[in-house]
């Protein structure tokens, strides 16, 4: 009898450890995918600044044409889309399973900073998905021929960003992205075990600067384009 109880306990403990390892591996993957997407955003924001060049869009349209015709870039687009979708799926899976694993009647008067940040990530992530649909309708789906629009993306950007409500929507989008990146930057280091009391504050400050620079780059294009005469 004692042996059976011991065996049952061992199996439960082993199963719990496997589930814990499985959950941790997902968190690590979410962190790595988030880091990859953050690097892409820096590239995307830098490329968008070309819209502000005083050349009638020649350089920016040449860049867009290269991005749309190069097979290596096309393959990268698939990888990027896959990384984005996987990042979303795993984040939602972790949020749901963590909530389900919480005992009924569980109550914690003072929520930790990590818990609040994680909850913020989920909600800002959902808002980002909604905003990206707007962005895809304005640009990416036009490139794919799924919706009508100007294939001269320099002119398309000017036409869209000079509409007040669209410009405001994009600026709000960048604010949401800022909050998501601001927490996500530090969360990557925490998940990978690289965050500690000695470097934690510096990591958070760098994350704020990184998120601010990227979002300001995006916002600058929208604001200046909005103020320009088409």
Please annotate each region the language model reported:
Residues 2-230:
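Membrane-embedded alpha-helical bundles that constitute the cytochrome b-like, heme-associated redox core
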């Amino acid at each position: 009898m004692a042996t059976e109880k011991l065996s049952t306990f061992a199996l439960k403990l082993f199963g719990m450890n496997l589930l814990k390892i499985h959950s941790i591996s997902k968190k690590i993957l979410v962190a790595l995918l988030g880091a990859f997407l953050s690097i892409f955003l820096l590239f995307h924001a830098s490329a968008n600044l070309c819209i502000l060049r005083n050349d009638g869009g020649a350089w920016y349209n040449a860049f867009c044409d290269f991005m749309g015709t190069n097979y290596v870039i096309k393959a990268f687009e698939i990888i990027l889309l896959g990384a984005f979708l996987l990042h979303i799926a795993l984040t939602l899976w972790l949020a749901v399973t963590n909530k389900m694993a919480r005992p009924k009647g569980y109550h914690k008067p003072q929520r930790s900073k990590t818990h609040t940040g994680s909850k913020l990530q989920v909600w800002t992530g959902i808002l980002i998905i909604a905003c990206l649909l707007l962005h895809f309708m304005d640009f990416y789906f036009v490139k794919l021929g799924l919706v009508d629009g100007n294939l001269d993306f320099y002119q398309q950007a000017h036409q869209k960003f000079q509409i007040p409500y669209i410009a405001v929507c994009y600026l709000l989008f960048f604010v949401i992205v800022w909050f998501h990146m601001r927490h996500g930057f530090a969360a990557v280091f925490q998940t990978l075990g690289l965050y500690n009391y000695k470097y934690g504050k510096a990591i958070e400050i760098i994350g704020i600067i990184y998120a601010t620079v990227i979002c300001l780059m995006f916002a600058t294009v929208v604001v200046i384009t909005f103020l320009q005469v088409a």
